[in-house]
């Protein structure tokens, strides 16, 4: 196996992970990464380098593609699911933290219909259509759920809110 430098002193790139097949990289950074290909601002505006964006990078061609250039929420983290090939993104949009999927083949982004306003974290199974996540909303504390990524069904696993708020009327 040979070692190759893909970037040197790459400004605005925060990290990267391999695709499930090992042929591409999912790159985290600001819209300024890769010579500004992720920017979606008017001329004369200054970019927000804290606005998290996702890119696909092909090491063979050394070409990058902006996945979330026209996507409004800020991407805070993402995971490329081995089971279904989708990229699952945790996002921030004002007071909400939601999970979206991105199809890396066509760039189509879809919000998961999850019952909480603030999703704190999630974990994906490698060999099954299962995601566990926890979050809360304005009227409840943390709850843990299971989500079937194929059927799109959510199941409440544990309601910490019931314990925390049991004496509140």
Task: Locate each region found by the language model.
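Hydrophobic beta-strand positions that form the internal "hydrophobic ladder"
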Residues: 22-26, 86-87, 129-132
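Extended amphipathic secondary-structure runs
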Residues: 1, 58-62, 77-80, 84
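Short loop/turn segments that connect beta-strands within beta-propeller blades
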Residues: 58-62, 103-107, 148-152
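A flexible loop/linker signature enriched in serine peptidases of the S9 family
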Residues: 1, 6-14, 27-55, 66-76, ...
């Amino acid at each position: 196996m040979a070692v190759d430098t893909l970037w040197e002193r790459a400004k605005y790139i925060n990290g990267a992970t391999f695709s499930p097949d090992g042929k591409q990289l999912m790159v985290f950074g600001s819209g300024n990464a890769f010579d500004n290909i992720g920017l979606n601002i008017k001329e004369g505006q200054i970019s927000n380098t804290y606005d998290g964006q996702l890119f696909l990078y092909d090491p063979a061609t050394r070409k990058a593609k902006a996945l979330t250039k026209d996507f409004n929420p800020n991407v805070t983290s993402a995971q490329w699911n081995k089971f279904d090939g989708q990229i699952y993104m945790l996002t921030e949009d004002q007071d909400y933290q939601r999970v979206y999927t991105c199809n890396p083949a066509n760039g189509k982004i879809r919000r998961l219909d999850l019952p909480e306003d603030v999703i704190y974290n999630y974990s994906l199974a490698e060999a099954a259509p299962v995601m566990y996540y926890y979050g809360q909303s304005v009227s409840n504390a943390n709850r843990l759920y299971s989500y079937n990524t194929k059927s799109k069904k959510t199941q409440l696993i544990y309601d910490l809110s019931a314990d925390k708020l049991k004496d509140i009327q």
